[in-house]
């Protein structure tokens, strides 16, 4: 079952606020997960709005595969943040070993690229990452786009 909710605010809000949208729908939840889109982020990511942010969950092998592909294309890491995982007893969560949020610099060859050229690069790269992670069952790419 799909659940959709939205919060729009002129001031920054903590992402956990979005999880409150699920409260009224706890009964009958099919463990399919919950995802949300964040824009105009503050905190760790506030100073990197023009650079692509990769968000992914992966095994150790999946992380290595993704890093190899990104390096081969010419992306360089500017900043990486990993959330703390809270493994409480009783929760039916099968956590991946790595949850990664990386801000990346475009390849040097894209220094003077147009917006359309950069967007095409990001889409092609995300597809390449998703394909290899799916084939190896080693992770998921959630987003690869600037804020």
Predicted regions and their residues:
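N-terminal segments that mediate ammonia production and transfer
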Residues: 1-147
């Amino acid at each position: 079952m799909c659940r959709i909710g939205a919060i729009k605010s002129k001031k920054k809000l903590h992402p956990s606020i979005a999880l409150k949208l699920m409260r009224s729908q706890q009964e009958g939840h099919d463990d399919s997960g919950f995802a949300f889109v964040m824009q105009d982020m503050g905190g760790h990511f506030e100073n990197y709005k023009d650079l692509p942010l990769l968000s992914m969950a992966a095994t150790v092998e999946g992380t290595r595969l993704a890093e190899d592909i990104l390096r081969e294309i010419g992306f360089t890491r500017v900043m990486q943040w990993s959330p703390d995982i809270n493994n409480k007893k009783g929760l039916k969560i099968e956590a991946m070993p790595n949850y990664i949020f990386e801000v990346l610099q475009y390849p040097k060859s894209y220094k003077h690229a147009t917006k359309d050229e950069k967007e095409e690069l990001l889409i092609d790269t995300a597809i390449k990452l998703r394909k290899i992670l799916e084939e190896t069952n080693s992770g998921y790419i959630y987003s690869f786009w600037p804020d």
